[in-house]
């Protein structure tokens, strides 16, 4: 979100028609964003990717990001599903990387819970505004999760989207990420 204005200016200045996608990866608290997480339940949050599809969605992303920092910050800026539901209008949602909740449920062989959560997200964002992510990153667990995502898409009709978990632009920047 912090680079949205610069991205928009660069897209307008581009020689070809470039449509910027403004979005962010958010941390979703497993319980309330107002409760600190404890070591006994892991890190206490999951990842989710949100992309504004219109001006209302952009304003809602700003609200979610601001609330994550001002109300939900505990080691990381977090929101919860209650707040996400309140500000879901105008936003497209992707299921997230391996740290996404659906993927974590698949990792624990909780397929029925993963399917229910995917249906809940589809209901929250609207039928045409939630996608299940597939990634190919050389991680063996990712391949297992991808197989589960494909089966889930066939059962639920939720569409698939191919993405990747990008953390740096150039290979030489990898040291800063690591």
Segments predicted by a language model, with ranges:
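Phosphodiester-processing cores and adjacent nucleic acid-binding clamps
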Residues: 1-178
């Amino acid at each position: 979100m912090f680079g949205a204005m610069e991205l928009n200016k660069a897209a307008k200045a581009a020689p070809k028609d470039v449509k910027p996608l403004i979005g962010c990866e958010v941390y979703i608290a497993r319980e309330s964003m107002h409760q600190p997480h404890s070591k006994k339940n892991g890190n206490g949050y999951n990842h989710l990717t949100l992309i504004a599809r219109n001006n209302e969605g952009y304003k809602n992303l700003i609200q979610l990001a601001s609330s994550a920092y001002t109300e939900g910050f505990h080691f990381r800026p977090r929101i919860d599903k209650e707040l996400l539901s309140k500000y879901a209008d105008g936003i497209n949602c992707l299921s997230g990387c391996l740290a996404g909740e659906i993927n974590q449920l698949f990792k624990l062989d909780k397929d029925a819970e993963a399917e229910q959560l995917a249906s809940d997200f589809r209901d929250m964002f609207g039928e045409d505004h939630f996608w299940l992510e597939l990634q190919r990153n050389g991680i063996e667990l990712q391949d297992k999760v991808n197989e589960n995502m494909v089966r889930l898409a066939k059962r639920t009709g939720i569409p698939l989207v191919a993405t990747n978990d990008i953390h740096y632009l150039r290979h030489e920047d990898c040291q800063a990420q690591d």
